[in-house]
Protein backbone atom coordinates (compact mmCIF):
# COMPACT_ATOMS: atom_id res chain seq x y z
CA UNK A 1 0.00 0.00 0.00
CA UNK A 2 1.42 3.34 -1.06
CA UNK A 3 1.57 6.21 1.40
CA UNK A 4 2.06 8.82 -1.35
CA UNK A 5 -0.63 11.48 -1.46
CA UNK A 6 -2.29 12.14 -4.76
CA UNK A 7 -2.15 15.74 -5.86
CA UNK A 8 -5.18 17.05 -7.78
CA UNK A 9 -4.31 18.04 -11.31
CA UNK A 10 -6.47 21.18 -11.15
CA UNK A 11 -8.51 22.89 -8.46
CA UNK A 12 -12.23 22.11 -8.48
CA UNK A 13 -14.50 25.11 -8.77
CA UNK A 14 -18.22 25.02 -8.18
CA UNK A 15 -20.37 27.79 -9.58
CA UNK A 16 -23.85 28.06 -8.21
CA UNK A 17 -26.45 30.43 -9.50
CA UNK A 18 -29.44 30.96 -7.25
CA UNK A 19 -32.65 32.00 -8.90
CA UNK A 20 -35.61 32.91 -6.75
CA UNK A 21 -38.91 31.98 -8.32
CA UNK A 22 -41.97 33.77 -7.03
CA UNK A 23 -45.23 31.98 -7.64
CA UNK A 24 -48.68 32.96 -6.55
CA UNK A 25 -51.55 30.80 -5.44
CA UNK A 26 -54.09 29.96 -8.13
CA UNK A 27 -56.38 33.02 -8.23
CA UNK A 28 -60.14 33.17 -8.05
CA UNK A 29 -62.30 35.06 -10.54
CA UNK A 30 -62.27 38.66 -9.26
CA UNK A 31 -65.16 39.73 -11.50
CA UNK A 32 -67.23 36.82 -10.21
CA UNK A 33 -66.31 37.75 -6.63
CA UNK A 34 -67.38 41.36 -7.21
CA UNK A 35 -70.71 40.19 -8.70
CA UNK A 36 -71.25 37.93 -5.66
CA UNK A 37 -70.45 40.88 -3.36
CA UNK A 38 -72.96 43.08 -5.23
CA UNK A 39 -75.61 40.39 -4.84
CA UNK A 40 -75.00 40.29 -1.06
CA UNK A 41 -74.98 44.08 -0.78
CA UNK A 42 -78.30 44.29 -2.67
CA UNK A 43 -79.91 41.48 -0.67
CA UNK A 44 -78.27 41.38 2.78
CA UNK A 45 -80.88 38.95 4.16
CA UNK A 46 -79.97 36.24 1.63
CA UNK A 47 -79.07 32.82 3.02
CA UNK A 48 -77.92 29.50 1.64
CA UNK A 49 -78.40 26.05 3.13
CA UNK A 50 -75.59 23.53 3.53
CA UNK A 51 -76.71 19.91 3.66
CA UNK A 52 -74.74 16.96 5.01
CA UNK A 53 -75.86 13.34 5.51
CA UNK A 54 -73.88 11.39 8.12
CA UNK A 55 -73.98 7.59 8.35
CA UNK A 56 -72.45 5.67 11.25
CA UNK A 57 -70.31 2.66 10.24
CA UNK A 58 -69.76 1.29 13.73
CA UNK A 59 -67.93 2.18 16.91
CA UNK A 60 -67.34 5.94 16.43
CA UNK A 61 -66.45 5.90 12.72
CA UNK A 62 -68.88 7.78 10.48
CA UNK A 63 -69.08 8.95 6.89
CA UNK A 64 -70.53 12.36 6.08
CA UNK A 65 -71.77 12.84 2.54
CA UNK A 66 -71.75 16.32 1.02
CA UNK A 67 -73.04 16.58 -2.54
CA UNK A 68 -71.08 14.44 -5.00
CA UNK A 69 -67.82 14.61 -3.02
CA UNK A 70 -66.00 11.71 -1.41
CA UNK A 71 -67.33 11.19 2.10
CA UNK A 72 -65.72 12.97 5.01
CA UNK A 73 -64.58 10.27 7.43
CA UNK A 74 -64.79 10.99 11.15
CA UNK A 75 -63.57 8.80 14.00
CA UNK A 76 -62.39 9.15 17.56
CA UNK A 77 -58.88 8.40 18.85
CA UNK A 78 -58.11 5.16 20.64
CA UNK A 79 -58.19 6.76 24.11
CA UNK A 80 -61.82 7.76 23.42
CA UNK A 81 -62.72 4.23 22.25
CA UNK A 82 -62.52 4.95 18.53
CA UNK A 83 -60.33 3.30 15.91
CA UNK A 84 -58.27 6.45 15.18
CA UNK A 85 -58.75 5.98 11.42
CA UNK A 86 -59.68 9.60 10.74
CA UNK A 87 -59.85 13.00 12.42
CA UNK A 88 -62.12 13.41 15.43
CA UNK A 89 -65.30 15.53 15.19
CA UNK A 90 -63.68 18.53 16.89
CA UNK A 91 -60.75 18.33 14.47
CA UNK A 92 -63.19 18.31 11.56
CA UNK A 93 -64.83 21.43 13.02
CA UNK A 94 -61.42 23.13 13.21
CA UNK A 95 -60.73 21.99 9.64
CA UNK A 96 -63.93 23.72 8.53
CA UNK A 97 -62.85 26.85 10.38
CA UNK A 98 -59.41 26.76 8.75
CA UNK A 99 -60.93 26.24 5.32
CA UNK A 100 -63.38 29.10 5.81
CA UNK A 101 -60.66 31.47 7.02
CA UNK A 102 -58.43 30.53 4.06
CA UNK A 103 -61.34 31.16 1.66
CA UNK A 104 -62.01 34.52 3.31
CA UNK A 105 -58.34 35.53 3.19
CA UNK A 106 -58.25 34.62 -0.51
CA UNK A 107 -61.43 36.60 -1.20
CA UNK A 108 -60.33 39.71 0.71
CA UNK A 109 -56.88 39.63 -0.90
CA UNK A 110 -58.51 39.32 -4.32
CA UNK A 111 -60.83 42.24 -3.51
CA UNK A 112 -57.82 44.34 -2.45
CA UNK A 113 -55.86 43.12 -5.51
CA UNK A 114 -53.13 41.52 -3.41
CA UNK A 115 -51.54 38.41 -4.91
CA UNK A 116 -50.90 35.72 -2.32
CA UNK A 117 -48.19 33.09 -2.58
CA UNK A 118 -48.93 31.17 0.63
CA UNK A 119 -51.72 30.68 3.15
CA UNK A 120 -51.40 28.23 6.01
CA UNK A 121 -53.79 28.26 8.95
CA UNK A 122 -52.72 26.60 12.22
CA UNK A 123 -55.46 25.97 14.77
CA UNK A 124 -55.70 24.63 18.30
CA UNK A 125 -58.89 24.19 20.26
CA UNK A 126 -59.30 23.31 23.92
CA UNK A 127 -62.35 21.05 24.03
CA UNK A 128 -64.18 19.62 27.01
CA UNK A 129 -66.27 16.46 27.12
CA UNK A 130 -66.57 15.78 30.87
CA UNK A 131 -70.13 14.51 30.43
CA UNK A 132 -68.81 11.70 28.16
CA UNK A 133 -71.30 12.69 25.42
CA UNK A 134 -74.05 12.56 28.07
CA UNK A 135 -73.41 8.87 28.72
CA UNK A 136 -73.03 9.07 32.48
CA UNK A 137 -70.10 11.46 32.92
CA UNK A 138 -70.29 14.82 34.67
CA UNK A 139 -73.97 15.30 33.83
CA UNK A 140 -74.23 18.42 36.00
CA UNK A 141 -72.22 20.31 33.37
CA UNK A 142 -74.09 22.85 31.25
CA UNK A 143 -73.61 23.41 27.50
CA UNK A 144 -71.35 26.47 27.96
CA UNK A 145 -68.96 24.25 29.97
CA UNK A 146 -68.70 21.66 27.19
CA UNK A 147 -67.29 21.77 23.70
CA UNK A 148 -64.63 24.22 22.63
CA UNK A 149 -63.59 26.47 25.48
CA UNK A 150 -60.86 28.31 23.56
CA UNK A 151 -59.63 28.39 19.98
CA UNK A 152 -56.30 29.81 18.90
CA UNK A 153 -55.49 30.51 15.26
CA UNK A 154 -52.19 31.51 13.67
CA UNK A 155 -52.06 32.37 9.98
CA UNK A 156 -48.96 32.21 7.82
CA UNK A 157 -49.67 34.37 4.80
CA UNK A 158 -47.29 35.63 2.14
CA UNK A 159 -47.98 37.88 -0.81
CA UNK A 160 -47.04 41.01 -2.68
CA UNK A 161 -48.10 43.36 0.13
CA UNK A 162 -46.47 44.57 3.37
CA UNK A 163 -47.06 42.58 6.57
CA UNK A 164 -49.46 45.25 7.88
CA UNK A 165 -51.70 44.87 4.81
CA UNK A 166 -51.59 41.07 5.07
CA UNK A 167 -52.59 41.30 8.74
CA UNK A 168 -55.46 43.62 7.83
CA UNK A 169 -56.63 41.06 5.24
CA UNK A 170 -56.50 38.25 7.83
CA UNK A 171 -58.37 40.28 10.47
CA UNK A 172 -61.02 41.36 7.94
CA UNK A 173 -61.51 37.76 6.77
CA UNK A 174 -61.83 36.59 10.39
CA UNK A 175 -64.42 39.27 11.20
CA UNK A 176 -66.64 38.21 8.28
CA UNK A 177 -65.99 34.43 8.36
CA UNK A 178 -69.32 32.55 8.40
CA UNK A 179 -67.78 29.58 10.22
CA UNK A 180 -65.84 31.69 12.75
CA UNK A 181 -69.00 33.68 13.47
CA UNK A 182 -70.99 30.45 13.87
CA UNK A 183 -68.50 29.41 16.54
CA UNK A 184 -68.36 32.82 18.26
CA UNK A 185 -72.08 33.52 18.35
CA UNK A 186 -75.00 31.57 19.77
CA UNK A 187 -77.18 30.23 16.94
CA UNK A 188 -80.59 28.58 16.96
CA UNK A 189 -80.14 24.81 17.01
CA UNK A 190 -82.81 22.15 16.82
CA UNK A 191 -82.69 18.36 16.61
CA UNK A 192 -85.45 15.79 16.17
CA UNK A 193 -86.01 12.26 14.96
CA UNK A 194 -86.27 11.91 11.18
CA UNK A 195 -89.56 10.72 9.70
Where are these regions (language model features)?
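Extended beta-strand/beta-hairpin segments
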Residues: 2-95, 105-195
Amino acid sequence: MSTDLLEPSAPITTITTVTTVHTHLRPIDRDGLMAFADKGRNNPASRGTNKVHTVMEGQYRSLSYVGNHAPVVVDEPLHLFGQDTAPAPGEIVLSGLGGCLAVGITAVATWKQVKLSKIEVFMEGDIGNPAAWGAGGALQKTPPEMGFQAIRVKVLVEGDAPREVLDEIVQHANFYSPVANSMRNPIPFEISLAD
